Design a protein with these regions (language model features):
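Structured alpha-helical
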Residues: 1-138
Length: 138
């Protein structure tokens, strides 16, 4: 148990799972219903049913800043493309950026980005549940 959780300082209401899932991400235009940027690579770690920590080297994608150009009303969320854990192929989920930190030292990805999943459909929830289940037993 972590010190924050032991002292009652951890505000999370959902369990987090330590994973390392390579993903692609892009900024989405919710009004036009199309991508604003090309896809870039990242890795999801520390994932729960409502959010995750994304590791990436890209805080700026084609002129769009992941946090500064992040519309709180959900018009410009990130779209993450994840590998399917139940079948072949991939699936997408939308997320809002909550925070980010630049990580010092040698690491594949230089930024940690806090995400909250948004507008999760029933099929996305099933895929997310399957992903969490596959990593809770490993």
């Amino acid at each position: 148990m972590g010190l924050r959780k032991y002292l009652g300082l951890d505000r999370r209401s959902h369990s987090r799972y330590q994973v390392a899932v390579e993903v692609e991400l892009q900024i989405w235009d919710g009004v036009e219903q199309k991508p604003r940027t090309e896809k870039v690579r990242g890795r999801l770690i520390d994932i729960s049913p409502i959010g995750a920590c994304l590791q990436t080297n890209h805080m700026l994608i084609e002129g769009y800043h992941l946090l500064l150009d992040n519309d709180p009303s959900g018009q410009t969320p990130l779209v993450l493309t994840l590998p399917s854990s139940t079948s072949e192929g991939q699936w997408d989920i939308k997320a809002q950026v909550l925070w980010y930190n630049k990580v010092e030292g040698e690491r594949k990805y230089q930024f940690d980005v806090g995400l909250s999943f948004v507008d999760v459909s029933p099929s996305e929830r099933e895929n997310l549940h399957a992903l969490l289940k596959s990593h809770s037993s490993s």
